Amino acid sequence: MGKECYYLSWILKFHLLLVLIQLVDSGSTIRFLPGFQGPLPFELETGYIGVGEAEKDQMFYYFIKSESNPEKDPLLLWLSGGPFCSSFTALIYENGPIAFKAEEYNGSIPSLVSTTYAWTKVASILYLDQPVGTGFSYSRNPLADIPSDTGVAKPVNEFLHKWLDKHPEFLSNPLYVAGNSYSGIVIPTIVQEISNGNHLDSKPQINLQGFVLGNPATDTDIDLNSRIPFAHGKALISDEHYESLKRSCQGNYISVNPRNTKCLKLLEDFKKCVSGISEEYILKPDCMWLYSCMANLHSLSEYWANEKSVRKALLVNEGTVRKWIRCNTEIAYNKDIRSSVPYHKYISIEGYRSLVFSGDHDMLVPFLGTQAWIRSLNYSIVDDWRPWMVQNQVAGYTRTYANKMTFATVKGGGHTSEYKPVETYIMIKRWLSGQPL
């Protein structure tokens, strides 16, 4: 009898341990966050999914369920750029249901407030910290290989399959892979990886419908070479300077022959001329010491995420990340994809929908370059250039191509949605529902 009780007790403990492990791996619901008054008015889940050999790489995510119809609304897998910028950047500054209150940091936990422009009003969003080393994602062993562009797709695809295995209620929801900035390089590779897996009958089958890219880095040469024409078009350099640059550099401002001293001198003059301009948003004032500045608002995330009470609330594994950094530029990374245009050509054939949008005051990845690589895909236009409106005002311009790609500018917008959050929310709401912009 004693042995039977012992074995029964052991079996119960073993099953309890399995349940606890599953709960930790599946993620847990967060009802309160430090800095926010009262319970959260939306459903937030955080957790880790192990990927790679022996699941040594633990990928951290924030999942916010759609506030409208989560059973049917699209599921967005969101990847922020950088590389190594936490997806919390998008959640808190660009398209999430909460944001930091614009006030001077006084040493206490920064305050959080609700937003009116959350994309989670029309979609469930899975914000992923990737690659490993980003945000709260970590590896149980020291990184054996330097992360790279070409190495992103496989672990993200593995993460998504495992997450959907644990959240089967979202398997039938339309899935879109979304992101901005540098994620424009890797998202097409991820879409291709997921698509190939579906063709190979990988389980679970993913209801992939397309992708969304905001101000996406795509082709190094095209993106960088478009900065000078953009600067001229925005009256940042003179006609004479621009014409001299075109003549001396012959349209190539990146890989300049060292013997072409005239071109190099003109490029130096260009850099000096725009040195006081923010590349991310050319209208952004130099206001480093004002609490409402973007730079100071961005610093609030690091104060907040490094609070012990915050990490406890988010269920971050203790001792895994010494210091949370919003964009961790200290980690080595191999940028081994110079152009993602070939991936776009491949996934265009598959017939996926896509939305590519550009803030028209972004000089980091100018809309001129984005238009250039889209033209290189050689698809006919099915809805030509026209304004799209918000409250009877022009919010930007748009056109749609035969490969189901919609391009849109955001008037007065910068490198990310945070500069025009209301307009980009209305844009994504219309596009996800299949309406014209």
Curated annotation (Swiss-Prot):
Q: Which GO terms describe its molecular function?
A: serine-type carboxypeptidase activity
Question: Where are the disulfide bridges?
Answer: 85-327, 249-263, 287-293
Q: What is its main location?
A: secreted
Q: Which GO terms describe its biological process?
A: proteolysis
A single Pfam family, by name?
Peptidase_S10
What are the EC numbers? 3.4.16.-
The EC category is hydrolase
Q: Which GO terms describe its cellular component?
A: extracellular region
Tell whether Signal is among the UniProt keywords: yes
Query: Which chain positions lie within coiled-coil regions?
Result: none
Residues spanning the signal sequence: 1-26
Q: Where in the cell is it found?
A: Secreted
Q: What are the protein's UniProt keywords?
A: Carboxypeptidase, Disulfide bond, Glycoprotein, Hydrolase, Protease, Secreted, Signal
Disulfide bond recorded as keyword? yes
Q: Could you tell me what this protein does?
A: Probable carboxypeptidase.
What family does the Swiss-Prot or TrEMBL record give for this protein? Belongs to the peptidase S10 family.
* PANTHER family listed in its UniProt record: SERINE CARBOXYPEPTIDASE-LIKE 14-RELATED (PTHR11802:SF316), SERINE PROTEASE FAMILY S10 SERINE CARBOXYPEPTIDASE (PTHR11802)
Protein name in the entry? Serine carboxypeptidase-like 17
